[in-house]
A protein has these predicted regions:
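Non-catalytic C-terminal accessory region of glycerolipid acyltransferases
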Residues: 2-5, 98-218
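Catalytic core of membrane glycerolipid acyltransferases/transacylases, capturing the structured
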Residues: 9, 14-15, 22-23, 35-94, ...
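Short amphipathic alpha-helical segments and helix-helix/interface helices
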Residues: 17, 79, 134-138
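Short gly/ser/thr-rich secondary-structure transition/capping motifs
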Residues: 22-30, 94, 154-155
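Hydrophobic anchor at the start of a short beta-strand
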Residues: 27, 64, 113
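Generic structural signal for residues in well-ordered beta-strands
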Residues: 27-29, 87, 145, 171
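Short, flexible active-site-adjacent loop segments at beta-strand->alpha-helix junctions, enriched
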Residues: 33, 47-48, 55, 60, ...
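A short beta-turn/loop motif at secondary-structure boundaries
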Residues: 33-36, 164
């Protein structure tokens, strides 16, 4: 991967973030070779903390775009900061056609898009169900779909906490999901649901592998 096409401010933040992540969180990345170095890629990640986009951005060397709930885009200086981080707003609770259209555009332009298939942060770390919009986007674009599991961010910055604390954080990238069977199927809610199930199964497998490694290191 290369950083030639990164926005200057975004590139600078990544340069700053990486050593800080390693120092403060004992940051480790596994399976980064599973992320294609070019072309549109959907990174499907469990959502545990507001730190998640930061640790993903610090582990890849490409421009990373991601959705963030629309309520975060105020006041204006927060909005400008989020936009500088390649974030774009999405309304939760109902299908947001504008956000979906933007996501498809980003992928068709050959970019890396971070998606939280569950739609919101987990309260207790358990994995939930993928939103149908995830399957729709994956079905409509000829892009790689990579499951990702992040571990430790919930301990570092749990939901409801105002403060960040030191914790071991790891990111595990799985192999791209074989999408051929789904993309050859008709566009339907059933197909989108099956894609979502495959995505969450991929994340669950990575979570299980991580838990086994943690038990083995004790």
């Amino acid at each position: 991967m290369n950083s030639r096409n990164m926005k200057p401010f975004y590139h600078l933040l990544c340069i700053i973030a990486r050593p800080l992540l390693k120092a403060f969180f004992k940051f480790q990345v596994f399976g980064i070779e599973n992320v294609p170095s070019a072309g549109g890629v959907m990174l499907m990640i469990n959502h545990a903390s507001y730190l998640d986009p930061i640790v993903i951005g610090g582990s890849v060397n490409r421009n990373l775009y991601y959705m963030a709930k629309s309520t975060l885009f105020s006041p204006w200086f927060i909005k400008r900061f989020l936009i500088s981080l390649n974030a774009f707003p999405v309304r939760l609770g109902s299908p947001d056609r504008g956000a979906i259209k933007r996501a498809i555009q980003i992928l068709n332009e050959g970019n890396l898009l971070l998606i939280f298939p569950e739609g919101t942060r987990s309260i207790d770390g358990t994995l939930g169900k993928a939103q149908d919009g995830v399957g729709f986007i994956a079905h409509r674009t000829n892009t790689a779909v990579v499951p990702v599991f992040v571990d430790g961010t919930r301990a570092a910055w749990p939901r409801g906490s105002k403060f960040i604390k030191s914790a071991k954080v790891t990111v595990s990238y799985g192999k791209p999901i074989d999408m051929s069977i789904y993309r050859s199927s008709e566009a339907s809610r059933e197909t989108y649901s099956k894609i979502g199930e495959a995505v969450m199964a991929g994340i669950a497998d990575l979570k299980h592998e991580r838990e086994l490694l943690k038990k083995g290191s004790r």
